[in-house]
A protein has these predicted regions:
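Metal-dependent phosphoester/phosphodiester hydrolase catalytic core
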Residues: 3-9, 15-18, 26-490
Length: 490
């Protein structure tokens, strides 16, 4: 932990040194290393983003250009925009597309700085008459774990109207940490090499991810709607802390760390900012077809996760106390403010489908006894503490909605009362899932599609399991689960 403190001090020193460099740039000393992006499309406007890299420190100006054709033979809109080190030289503009071009048809955009021109991006808004939409779903894109081939492939298909990222857009771990064992071989060592803690750390890691060729290809192809999960902050985050943040303060104040992560996220993502920066939950309407509600199940209202090991006694596992605490009506995942907002939101539209874009699995899920499925006699050290809980029939993923059953029931009741058909989209697990969602009485309330990771390893790889045995067993013992795939990324 002393190493992390030293790194924080060195980062502060580096910032001070950079700030002392004289300002002023020649017109040719600009670069667009991080591509362009668009996001948060409404029926009349969309966010357009880029990052200008100057060779010297100081405020600078860039020009946004919009055209209805790719060669920009006719520019229908242009605007001078300012940026500086205060926003890490990122630029965002909320373009009122409806005034200049037809909704659904799309447009092209680019930026100029000096004599340098950025990549050309393509974006669009969705009119009230939209009847079809092709949407890509992504989650868990871990740079050192592998190439972002899924992004590249989606861009090359050239048929997406929109893509969603359900969280873990980037990871906080240092070199030598989670899923970095192949990083040097792949040429994907995380930057900085230490764990993200300061604003400088988060900015540098975001910059590295945005420089990836697959990422740049997809970002410029179609608008993005994104929400954060935990790794944009720190593993297993909740509203007042995180598993990967030391309680003794060796990693600094958690709230300061979270604020730094949020600031960098808003700077580097094509997302529309709200007055309360922590409030990322928001809604989008794609014609009368889809009412898309992006939730925050991670840090806005979430209570701390229950840890089964805390219910171990000398006489065994205290199931009575475990279930009493787990099922408490006071446990929140969304929080009352967000839940009330959802209720008002779903009652305000008559879209054919209500879709929740959110972070963690909503379906009820129990794990089989995997001790006999291990392909190696050596049990991973991190797995050993959990083996004693297998076979007890308790929920297995308490970081997901299974850890907050009362809150899940409250959400289900809202949807039942509003007579809404809904789809839950989830990320987080790195695996693919299809489940039918049921309320406490066993009545169907919706379906869930769990998205695989872009690169983070799946459960059978992490635990070294026999894939066929695991899939057959987990589907068999879970009533809601219809299908799962732990091995394919995408």
């Amino acid at each position: 932990m002393k190493r992390r403190q030293a790194l924080k001090i060195s980062s502060i020193g580096a910032i001070g040194l950079t700030a002392s460099i004289s300002s002023g740039c020649s017109k040719n000393n600009y670069f667009f290393h991080h591509g362009v992006a668009s996001g948060d499309p409404l029926n009349d406007r969309v966010i357009l983003w880029t990052r200008v890299t100057p060779q010297q420190v100081g405020p600078l100006e860039a020009i946004l250009e919009i055209s209805e054709n790719k060669n920009f033979s006719s520019i229908i809109f242009s605007k001078k925009l300012q940026t500086s080190s205060l926003s890490d030289y990122t630029i965002k503009y909320d373009f009122l597309a409806k005034q200049y071009c037809d909704s659904d048809m799309g447009f092209f955009y680019r930026f100029r700085a000096g004599n340098v021109i950025s990549d050309t991006g393509q974006s669009k808004t969705f009119s009230e008459n939209t009847t079809t939409a092709k949407i890509g779903i992504f989650s868990c894109s871990n740079f050192p774990a592998g190439y972002f081939n899924a992004y590249q492939a989606a861009a090359e298909k050239n048929n997406l109207d929109l893509w969603l990222h359900l969280g873990d857009y980037l990871y906080e771990y240092p070199m030598g940490g989670y899923a970095t064992d192949k990083a040097e071989k792949l040429g994907r060592v995380p930057e900085p090499k230490h764990e993200m803690i300061t604003l400088s750390d988060y900015r540098q890691r975001h910059a590295q991810y945005k420089e990836d060729q697959g990422s740049k290809a997809l970002h410029k192809h179609a608008p993005l709607i994104a929400v954060w999960d935990d790794h944009e902050f720190s593993n297993d985050a909740w509203k007042r802390g995180a598993e990967n943040h030391s309680e003794d303060g060796a990693e600094g104040d958690f709230y300061a760390r979270r604020s730094a992560a949020i600031k960098a996220y808003y700077e580097w993502m094509p997302i529309r900012e709200q007055k309360n920066k922590r409030r990322i939950f928001r809604e989008f309407k794609i014609g009368k077809l889809i009412h898309l509600i992006m939730l925050d199940t991670r840090q806005y209202g979430r209570d701390k996760q229950i840890q089964p090991k805390e219910y171990l006694t000398k006489s065994g596992f205290n199931q009575a106390k475990f279930y009493n605490d787990l099922n408490s009506n006071n446990r929140e995942l969304l929080g009352s403010e967000q839940l009330s907002w959802i209720e008002k939101s779903i009652l305000s539209t008559n879209a054919v489908w209500t879709i929740f874009g959110q972070q963690v699995l909503m379906a009820k899920l129990k794990f089989p006894d995997i001790s006999k499925m291990l392909r190696s006699e050596e049990i991973p050290s991190f797995l050993k503490p959990y083996l004693k809980f297998l076979g007890l029939g308790i929920p297995s993923n308490l970081d997901a909605w299974d850890g907050y059953p009362a809150e899940r029931n409250r959400l289900y009741q809202l949807m039942i009362n509003a007579k809404k058909r809904f789809i839950s989209l989830a990320g987080d697990t790195h695996n693919s899932w299809v489940s039918k969602l049921e309320d406490q009485s066993g009545s169907k309330v919706g379906i869930e599609l769990g998205a695989p990771s872009v690169t983070s390893p799946g459960i059978t790889d992490i635990l070294n399991l026999d894939e066929k045995k695991f899939v057959n067993s987990i589907v068999k013992i879970n009533k809601e689960l219809q299908w799962m795939d732990p091995s394919n990324r995408g």
